[in-house]
Amino acid sequence: ILRRFPLEAGVNPQFVEIDERAQNLLLDEVVEAIADGQGQSSFDGIAEHFTGPDLQKFLHAILNLDHHFDSHPDADGIWKALDLPAGYDDASLAQECFLPGDFQHIEELKALLMTKDENSNDFKAGLRLQAIPGPELTTADLPTLESVFLNKTGKAPGSAKIGSFPTKATRAELPGMAQVEALMLRVEAGRQSRLSLNVARRSLALYDFAAEFLGTYRARKQARGFLDFNDLIMRTRHLLSDERVATWVLFRLDGGIDHILVDEAQDTSPAQWDVIRLLAQEFTSGEGARAD
């Protein structure tokens, strides 16, 4: 269809369809250009959060969801969407969760826990607390503190283990137990803010990188007259949906299509189904309707 109506579809008449291998080579080229060029900050930002082993899979996911990146919310917009105050950061979170002297109370708790039986939950908790280096508590310590101080399951997951950790006997031995329990409650209260801040940062990094990546990818495709598979589908759908030219295109196609073969891979592709629907309408309506 695009070969027959390139001007109506807004594509280069000499466009080149690129296969998956050629596309992957282009993706590598684009990422390298971003990492070494003006978009380096966006690359560094996503690299800080991306932990998957398959970069190509990640890039293809962005391409498949490119319409979600048409608008680029700023940091304030993302923070607001996650119920975080503008400018909320690690310092804000630390101020909510920690008080001077908290690390000393953790050190005292840790020392006591490490004296318990090696098979006890108290001792195992002490081992986890060894991951906190000091000399003060920071937001980087919150996941460790949450793993020790908060319930993972039960009626109230994420709630502080007040009255249940450490064991009753150990609690009686710890002079600063009241201060530890106060810290437990602050860790509980700060958990949602920590998670939201993490999502906000990852979202901002993703939007920044996607904008740079998609812009560079599209520019390089256009300069070389390339169309990838998604381009073929989206351009065809737009062509058949454009009221200015769709009737003319379908009229010219009438008689040239006897059947539509649907591959099972299209079951999960709404855009491809749109193309099929638009083509099928010509079989069943208007002057082009088929008796059979």
Give the label of every model feature segment.
Residues 39-56, 290:
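Short, glycine/acidic-rich hinge or "gate" loops at secondary-structure transitions
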Residues 33, 51-52, 75:
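Generic N-terminal leader/targeting and pre-domain segments
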Residues 58-230:
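Conserved ATP-driven helicase/translocase motor core recognized via long
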